Amino acid sequence: MNQHSPLTVIAVAVVLSAGSVLVGRRRDDAADAPGRDEFPGGKVEAGEAVELAAARECFEESGVTVNVGQRLHVAQATSSAGPIEIHFHRAAPVDANVSPLPPFTWLKIENLTRCHFPPANAEVVRRLLADEHAG
């Protein structure tokens, strides 16, 4: 990895519906965080707004169309390609009855404690669990 690699911005949709959150699992052969759980997201294209990228990536990965809302958290991390900045945004499905494409599924928020997310997701998971316990 080049120490002068440009920063890559990642947009993530944290899709919430009826006490559940949309979660998938990365492929075992993924370059970064293989086999780890994840929220849908990916790279922000040049000139693209982070919120639009989160919605686009969510649909591309899970088949779920979402309305993207407030930013939950921004995390810094390093991927195999260099430094990344991850923008996590709260989102809601346009259709609450939609079935996501594998490997994504609806998971009760309290079950997030059983998941194995990359470290950059820890603050978002903590907040979701705290909000769930607060009612």
Question: Where are these predicted regions, by residue range?
Answer:
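Short secondary-structure junctions
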Residues: 61-68
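Active-site-adjacent beta-strand/loop module that shapes the phosphate/pyrophosphate-binding cleft
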Residues: 66, 74-105, 109, 126-128
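A broad helix-preferring feature
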Residues: 9-12, 38, 89
